[in-house]
């Protein structure tokens, strides 16, 4: 009787899934839905993934900025946060215990502004980046040489897997990594979350039903809707995956209202269907709990994240209605990691009828070509400044095509931190990328950002500060800059911005922290979607050890010297002898080594502390 009942139940679920079949994908890769939601449709009872409509708060919801401005909500957040960062900066500098470094003089309104950028790279980058953040968090149980850096920072930026870190801790009351990691559900492949067939059958039907709610409400759907439903179930709500929780809802949390932690940002790029993606020509978009938009190409426009998904023309809705809950937390995490759409489309679970149905449905309705692209309503259609982005037709197109920034080659999301209005002095660039043959970082992400900055400056982009000079990708490996921390841009007068007096507009100093194997071989494929508990702990530990050079006191002191370098330069203060020695040891001297003899160098390191320590 048990097996007969089970079979009938599974057949019922399968029939439900079959009833959800939707029209085939159009050329833009999304599934078109012809049933439109009514203007005054109301919020549904109970948790629902479907967006819905409300009255718009004003006639125009696009915030157009002047050059060097930042969105008003972000400015207010940072103003509230300044008292916290000033105190935290003093604590961080004092903890360095470095002679000649006056914490009171080097903090306050003229003190450093720090941005932390975590690279993408799937679950590998999420876990390793989380380990690095734990080393910087004053709430962490064990003191490290970077303790308090997180509290002293203004920005925290993620993309792809690191967007899951940034978004996940932000949604969970900016929890500690120790608490956040207890919520993870990675011990089975994300598409096969349990060993029990019955559970997985229900899992597949739930995902299909949830996305169908969005389609039935009149909104186009994409592979990222399905992928977002999967990834959100691993970040704190394993049963339902936050179906009616939005990214913008984070603004109501107490930590956010009090600006207790860095301003969180996740990034996206653009790609047109049928075209190759280029890190130089793509437009980078960003989302925070407050706003979604871009500084690129002189567009300088943002909308409240809360109203993402609204069809606008020149900032106004034609019928006065705005969309709510399109910025579903899971969808935004999925949209920032469209690299994984291929895994979503190509997964194969034939152990359940529901698994076979969803597998056939995704392959039948979403083309492999352009599968990494998602199309959303373009909130900047008709906005005058958007016409400057002719390559993406941003001013005239009704759709905005987004992809994973990871796919541009700029795997460390530095671009938001290079905007002049943000006044970032130093960027902590945590590189958990997989660019080398053996899946280790090789400096390529910094080279890609440098090339993009040079192209942007040549095109007359006045928003971007510029960037430090960096060595070639070949030199990164041949000179071992990818297996130890390196400071780039130590001389603020010698950057792509040219020789000038150092000000807040000077390009930031970049502290490069590559993934190095200390206790574990962390060169794991980005495509891997499950980790054992032991692997998670090993990666968290390696992320902490790698970012602190095995908690080396001298490195911590030199890190503090790097943090205050722009402040010293702006105020014409001579660095202490101790800091000068640090700059000699850690700053890139401008040395290159592109000799042909290095063409075949393969970076394949060993564990520095022994595997499993």
UniProtKB/Swiss-Prot annotation:
Q: Does the keyword Lipid metabolism apply?
A: yes
Glycosylated sites = 142, 173, 220, 244, 281, 319, 348, 365, 494, 499, 523, 551, 572
Write the Enzyme Commission number(s) for this entry.
3.1.1.5
According to the UniProt entry, where is the signal peptide? 1-21
What residues does the PLA2c domain cover? Answer: 55-593
SMART domains named among the record's database cross-references: PLAc
Q: Name one GO molecular function term.
A: lysophospholipase activity
Presence of keyword Glycoprotein: yes
Q: Which Gene3D superfamilies match?
A: Cytosolic phospholipase A2 catalytic domain
Q: What is this protein called?
A: Lysophospholipase 1
State the organism of origin: Schizosaccharomyces pombe (strain 972 / ATCC 24843) (Fission yeast)
Lineage at the top is: Eukaryota, Fungi, Dikarya, Ascomycota, Taphrinomycotina
